[in-house]
Amino acid sequence: MSKKLVAYFSASGNTAALAKSLADKAGADIYEIRPSVPYTNADLNWQNKQSRSSVEMSDHSSRPELADTSADIAAYDTIYIGFPVWWYIAPTIINTFLESYDFSGKKIILFATSGGSGFGKTVENLRTSAPNAEIIEGKVNPSAKDIEVLAEMD
C-alpha cells in the first residue's frame, strides 16, 4: 500500500471540503497549498480584468508565492492535488507548488471544483511543471461515489 497525500488549494472552501473527505476515505495525510498573500473576494472577481486572479491567469508564467514549502513530498508515493478550475486550467499557484518540489516517479491524481467547466487543458499545462511525474486526470466536482473511487486509485 502506498503512502498518500492530499494537497489542495481552495479559494472559497469548496475544494477544501472535498480534500478533507478524500483524505479521510483514502487514509491520506492532508496539506493545504496556501499563497503567501491570501486571496480576497476582490482578487477572485473573474469579471474584473484587473483582479489578481485575472492578471495571474492571463500570464501563464505567473507563479504566486507559496506561504510555505513544508510538504514532505519525498515521503509519499501518491499525491492527490485538488484545486478550483480557473479559465479552464488549474490556478497558477498549482504550477508554483509542482515546481517547488521534486515529483519524479510520483503518481499525481487531480481533482477539482468548477462552476461549469471540465479540466480543459489542465493536465497538459501541469505536465510541464512536473515532467517526471505521472499525472492522472481524476474528477471535476466529484460525487461521494467518485471520492471513493479516487481514494482507491494508487
Mark where each language-model region is.
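N-terminal beta1-alpha1-beta2 submodule of the flavodoxin-like/Rossmannoid cofactor-binding fold
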Residues: 1-78, 88-90, 95, 99, ...
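Alpha-helix N-cap/loop-to-helix initiation residues
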Residues: 12, 87, 115-119
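A structural micro-motif
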Residues: 26-28, 106, 133-134
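Short, conserved loop/helix-junction motifs that constitute active-site signature segments
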Residues: 73, 99-105, 128-130
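Glycine-rich, N-terminal phosphate-binding loop of Rossmann-like dinucleotide-binding domains
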Residues: 83-84
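Short, glycine-/small-residue-rich phosphate/pyrophosphate-handling segment
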Residues: 109-146
